[in-house]
A protein has these predicted regions:
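Active-site-adjacent structural elements in enzyme catalytic cores
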Residues: 1-209
């Protein structure tokens, strides 16, 4: 059965949020527009959906997915956030900045990498934040492209048999979120992206916004 597709406009946004949240709560995969690229999304509490994501992305169990937060203040519920991370979140969230942090003991396994870290973002997209809030849970996100392929910037670039619901937000920029690791008070830029971050000196100095 082909997936359901909805065009995201000001008039359809509320219905799109409700449909996306219902799809995720039902254990489905939703293809949604983020700030720069399209991504597959699943509810972290749905084991079948998580395993389906892993199979689609050929993702080993020791590699976690990005977790999306509806509110920046939810960060502490899942990660150990040092001062440096809190400064970055305060300056750039909501926005296209993904923070890699030490996981709290009760953080979902689907987020965890083998080194004990998790990746979190409070997205700049109001639509995406509304979807996460409407699910009442933590939403996993991963880019909607095959490993080694360019990111998907159009809904039609993604195979229709890979998702249950697609929300068409038009053509996107193709610029991913900036990926920054902040563990033990030190910062490392893992991937350059939409947010420019200056690496501080190793004395743990503050990061300018």
């Amino acid at each position: 059965m082909p997936p359901v597709r909805l065009r995201l406009t000001r008039e359809t946004e509320r219905a799109a949020v409700e449909r996306a949240a219902a799809t995720l709560r039902g254990g489905g995969i939703a293809l949604l527009p983020a700030e720069g690229v399209y991504g597959f999304h699943a509810l972290a509490s749905s084991e079948p959906a998580v395993e389906r994501l892993r199979a689609m992305k050929a993702r080993a169990p020791e590699r976690g997915f990005i977790g999306l937060l509806a509110r920046a203040e939810d960060l502490d519920a899942y990660a150990e956030a040092p001062r440096l991370a809190l400064e970055l979140a305060s300056a750039h969230w909501p926005g296209p900045l993904t923070l890699v942090l030490a996981a709290r003991p009760d953080a979902p396994n689907a987020l965890r990498a083998s080194d004990g870290t998790i990746a979190l973002r409070c997205p700049g997209s109001e639509f995406l934040r509304a979807v996460v809030a409407a699910t009442g849970g933590l939403v996993l996100s991963t880019s909607a492209n095959e490993p080694g392929s360019p990111p998907a910037v159009r809904l039609d670039a993604v195979a229709a048999d890979s998702y249950d619901l697609g929300i068409d937000g038009g053509d996107l920029s193709g610029i991913p979120s900036t990926l920054v690791r902040v563990v033990s008070g030190y910062l490392e830029i893992l991937r350059a992206g939409a947010v420019r971050i200056a690496e501080p000196p190793l004395d743990g100095g503050a990061v300018p916004p």
